[in-house]
Structure formats: C-alpha cells, structure tokens
Amino acid sequence: MSSSITPSLIAADLFSVDRLVAVVTGGATGIGLMIVKALEENGAKVYIIGRRKEVLDKVAKEEAKHGNIIPLQGDASSKPDLERIVAHITKETGYINLLVANAGISGPDPVRITPSTTLSELQRDLWSLDPSIFAQTFSVNVGTAYFSIAAFLPLLDAGNHKGNVVQSSQAIITSSIGAFGRVPLAHYAYSASKAAVTHMTKQFATALTKYKIRFNILAPGLYPSEMTAGIVKSFEQLSPEERATRVSPLGREGNTEDMAGCILWLASKAGAWLSGNVVVSDGGKLSVTPSSY
C-alpha cells in the first residue's frame, strides 16, 4: 500500500535528519567523527561513545554546531559499559532512531608479499603472528558490533514507537572495502573480520525484519583517520598516475563531505527503503582491483 503522506522531493526535506536521535560508537575520531558532525550539524542529537574522555569532551565542545553532541565515555566492547550507557540514554531520552556501530581496530601489520618474497619467508611472517592479536581483531571488529546491536535493540524499538521521524529505526555498521578486496591492503585478520561483520549485519537485516529495525553496511575505502594517518601521508608523495592506481581512480582519499553525503542519505528519509545493503564509498577502488563484491 502506498503512503498517504504527500511526498516531498525537496532535498532539504528528503535528506533531513532533524529531530533524529543517534548513537555513534568510535565517534570521536576519523570516520566516526565525520558521521557525528554531519548528523549534528543537520539537526540530529548525537551520543558519541569512546574510551578517551578528554577526546570526547573536546569533540562535544569544539565540533557541535547546535550543542547536541553528548559524550559518553565507555568501551563499546564491554558489556557492563554498554549496559550503563543504554541505561543513561533510556533515562535521559528514552529512545534512539539510529545506531552507528563504528568502533574498530586495524589489527596486525600487513603481510608484505613482493616479487622476491620466498615461500619460506611468507610462511614465517604468517606463523609469527600472536594468536591473541588475531583473535582480538575479530573480537573488536565483529564482537563490538554484535554486542552494540544487542544492547541498543530496545532503544531502537522505542524509536519506532516514538515516531519522531518518518523512517524506521536503523543500525549502520562500518565495515571496509577490505571485506571484498582479494589483494589485502591490511592484514588478513582485518579483512576477514570486516567480511564477517558485513555478513553478520546482512543476517540481522533478515532476522529482524518483522521488528521494523533496518540494518545497512557502510564500506569505506581510504579516509583520513588516526588508523590511516601513515598511509595517507605516504601517498602524498605519489604522482597523479600512481595515486589513481594506489589510492583510488579519482586520485584522492575520501573526505568529510564524501562521508557526510553517505550518512545523510542512509540516515534520512531518502534512505528509508534501504535494508541489508552495502554502501561502498571508495572513489572506485574496488572497480580496479581484484575483488568479490
């Protein structure tokens, strides 16, 4: 049945996140901060979760355009911390419309394979990794998203009942193009963890259909952040031709406007009919590298 609401094709209405209430884990730096700024500047109330109180407070003080960035210190991989944060938001606001599970780590250093690398050298590098570091990469990049989703389901459900926005409640999980690339740009553990969290999110999209809670995946390419600072700096010296090959066909890394465009589309009425989708924002990188996407 079609909606009885008269549709608006005005961009300011279609992409509006005014009155939206969001939670962003890992929201104080990098892509998370880009998402937070885009949402808050356009009228959303945004709770940001992170471990470093001083960084959270600085973001709330310096980046909020409307005073609606609320810092909540906590570790998104800790169930007690998540329970405490959910209780706080439940008491203060009572609902959320959007969860952005963005917290993650880069994992071990990549295993480099050059034309001169011998099989014995490769085997040595693969075998030398501490199993606990491999496991930690999965625990943070997959487990943190899993427990964040589980923790905030009641508040997302409450958002549907609140009806303060037209679109139904949603969780957006930050993955990576590393989930799809066959030439690993990071360690195998990182790429595999991002492939895992991508598939898990698709399963949630299917499993929770009847509850009207949507799930989508954001898969960025190279964006500037604390994790990618060294990579971005090393690419500054490349020629335009090399940048088009190694960074993206567009010859640059992503920026705040690129990420803002993605999140405003997904989080607003414009993205209300999306669930179970993967949104790749990589300047075309996957289109010119071996990948399974």
From Swiss-Prot:
It comes from the Eukaryota. Coiled coil: none annotated. NADP(+) binds at I31, N102, Y190, K194, S225. The keyword ATP-binding does not apply. Disulfide bonds: none annotated. The keyword Transcription does not apply. Short-chain dehydrogenase/reductase; part of the gene cluster that mediates the biosynthesis of the phomopsins, a group of hexapeptide mycotoxins which infects lupins and causes lupinosis disease in livestock. The role of phomF' within the phomopsins biosynthesis pathway has still to be determined. The pathway starts with the processing of the precursor phomA by several endopeptidases including kexin proteases as well as the cluster-specific S41 family peptidase phomP1 and the oligopeptidase phomG to produce 10 identical copies of the hexapeptide Tyr-Val-Ile-Pro-Ile-Asp. Belongs to the short-chain dehydrogenases/reductases (SDR) family. This is Short-chain dehydrogenase/reductase PhomF'. The lineage of its organism: Eukaryota, Fungi, Dikarya, Ascomycota, Pezizomycotina. The gene is PhomF'.
